[in-house]
A protein has these predicted regions:
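A beta-strand edge to alpha-helix "cap/lid" segment located at domain peripheries
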Residues: 48-159, 216-223, 228-292
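Soluble or luminal CAZymes and related metallo-dependent hydrolases
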Residues: 1, 39, 163, 167, ...
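Short, aromatic-enriched amphipathic alpha-helices that serve as compact interaction elements
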Residues: 1-13, 20, 147-179
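A generic secondary-structure micro-motif detector
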Residues: 161, 169, 201-202, 249
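A solvent-exposed, acidic/Ser-Thr-rich amphipathic alpha-helical stretch
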Residues: 14-68, 182-234
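Acidic, low-complexity intrinsically disordered regions
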Residues: 23, 43, 97, 124, ...
Length: 292
């Protein structure tokens, strides 16, 4: 069913996607769930408008496990590359749930350069939704040292190979457990790793180690939690989040960063890694910019 999104973006085909959506289907964009054909037609129209601002649309990687498919799309023009991740949960030819995470800051910057002269609000999109309300707990892992938290093996499908489970567990230990020594085991100099539109691990860019240190340094009392893992032999989508204290002008605020990470791997090494975080949704929800 991921092909319905691809057809919408590449061929401006609204009918195939419309036919696959039920009245009860849920569509997540901008950290807001949309229900029903009226709201969903509006989302399709906005995506069709967005694609006219880019020259190519490419499905860079995808993964499927049972009735769930996910992929990372690359929207490109001469000057800009924007990533977004889509996940479809379907049954009997109908989409039950469609989730999207978009590099909205990069999208807005490129989209607004095409607007009329004088339009300078480059970090906003007029049609981007208001996020759903969110209540955060004050869970502090320092006060619960013996608490057991979900790991890769707890959330990944039981038929996932042991090899994929082991690699993903190593990856989770690096990013959740601040395991800097594990970076060399997972990443090579040839690994493509991007956080939204920022590409790491290349000349003139931060290394993976530098990025991990930056993440740990800017987000205080950082607590990572897995939400879903979809994996096969060569690809995986990890949905996870970080709850943390973020320093702003008026002190500290508790924030949550929902993150979608698409991975491709080979010979126990990660070859491509794409992180997507919705910057506009974060700023709308917490009144502060992303810390990276």
């Amino acid at each position: 069913m991921l092909s319905t999104i691809q057809q919408l973006l590449e061929k401006q085909d609204t009918q195939t996607l419309t036919a696959a959506l039920l009245h009860s289907s849920r569509w997540l964009l901008g950290e807001r769930l949309h229900y029903g054909p009226i709201q969903q037609r509006g989302l399709m129209a906005n995506w069709l408008d967005i694609t006219t601002h880019f020259e190519t649309v490419e499905l860079c990687a995808k993964v499927q496990s049972g009735d769930v498919e996910a992929g990372v799309f690359c929207l490109s023009s001469a000057s800009t590359t924007t990533y977004f991740i889509a996940q479809c949960e379907h049954r009997n030819g109908a989409i039950k749930q469609l989730l999207q995470w978009v590099d909205s800051a990069s999208l807005a910057a490129h989209y607004n350069t095409k607007e009329a002269p004088g339009y300078d609000n480059s970090m906003s999109l007029p049609f981007w939704p208001e996020p759903d309300p969110l209540q955060l707990s004050e869970f502090d892992p320092q006060l619960h040292l013996k608490t057991t938290h979900a790991g890769i093996n707890d959330v990944v499908a039981s038929n996932t190979s042991d090899k994929s489970k082991a690699l993903l567990s190593q990856w989770w230990q690096v990013w959740q457990g601040f395991d800097t020594a594990g970076i060399k085991e997972l990443y090579s100099d040839a690994t493509h790793i991007s956080v939204n539109s920022q590409v790491l691990n290349k000349e003139g860019s931060p290394s993976v180690l530098s990025w991990l240190n930056q993440l740990e340094g800017k987000l205080h009392r950082r607590y990572c939690q897995l939400e879903q893992v979809i994996a096969d032999e060569r690809n995986a989508l990890v949905r996870w989040r970080i709850d943390a204290d973020l320093k702003i002008d008026n002190g500290l605020i508790r924030v949550r960063l929902p993150i979608a990470t698409m991975l491709t791997f080979n010979d126990n090494k990660i070859t491509n890694e794409y992180w997507v975080v919705d910057s506009i949704a974060f700023e709308k929800r917490f009144g502060a910019p992303l810390p990276f």
